[in-house]
Amino acid sequence: MDPILEEFERAISGLTYTSPTIDYVSDLTGQPVSSGIDAAYWARHLRNPVRFTDATATLHEKGISTFIEIGPDGVLSGLIRETLDREQDLVAVPMLRRDRPEPHTAVTAAAHAHTHGTPVTWTTLHGQATTIDLPTYAF
């Protein structure tokens, strides 16, 4: 990575960077970030080790127990479960799985999160559905 760092930083230095508007934990530092994200940050991110375990632990310490992996397969979900296995109510699920239909795996991930207390806006996934009244049963 070293040979391209300066060129990379120059290439992205013209972009506009703003402070995060939601809580953000960096896997460059493993700590929350509120400012300082600029071209130099992303160049360091490209070069330095990923501190994924530290970032995950920081999120968990802040009360996060549901993790949804956005990526091509479930590698990091397994790492989260392995790292934070002491937490029984932990959910770590991948949004996508290799060689499986995306709609199915995405809805499965949302369902896992929902059953563990994470609010899910189902109409975003399924669109507006027509509802009908069903007969009641005496059992």
Task: Identify what each model region corresponds to.
Residues 33-41:
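Gly-rich Lys/Arg/Thr-decorated short loops/hinges at beta-loop-alpha junctions or inter-strand turns
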Residues 1-6, 82-83:
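Short glycine/threonine-rich loop-to-helix capping motif typified by GTGT followed
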Residues 31-32, 75:
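Short, acidic Gly/Pro/Ser/Thr-rich loop/turn segments
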Residues 27-29:
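Reverse-transcriptase-like RNA-dependent polymerase core
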Residues 4, 35, 89-90:
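Alpha-helical context
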